[in-house]
Amino acid sequence: MKKYLSYIVALIGLTFSLSSCHTSAPRLDYKALAKASVRMGIDINKEDNHKLYIASAEWIGVPYRAGGDNKRGTDCSGLVSQLYKQVYNIRLSRSTDEQLKESNKVSRRNLREGDLVFFTSRASKKLSLIHI
């Protein structure tokens, strides 16, 4: 009897441990992806960062406003800061200079979707623009 009881307890334990290993694929919001694809004028592939594309599409048409970081108006560093918070749950500083300090350098050939790209003006060599 004790032998059977220990088998039953082991079987129940195994069942619970295996059931906790179950994972499911993330749900895709096909409507939001289709809308983002149309708004951005691009094809969004299965392996693309869907959350980034959907969030980015929401900002199309927002006017430029120096120092802005909301849908009433934004500049490039404000947009990057908001998208990183929304998509990656990462809080970046508000200024391009600070965002550069918080970043790790990556070679051009190793750039991946979601990496930050910084631009300088040719004349002054000062940081002037940031993009994802």
Predicted regions and their residues:
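Catalytic cysteine-centered active-site loop
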Residues: 39-40, 63-113
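Conserved small/polar residues in nucleotide/adenosyl-binding loops
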Residues: 130-132
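Bacterial Sec signal peptide processing site at the extreme N-terminus
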Residues: 15-38
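Post-signal-peptide N-terminal segment of Sec-exported extracytoplasmic proteins
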Residues: 28, 36-73
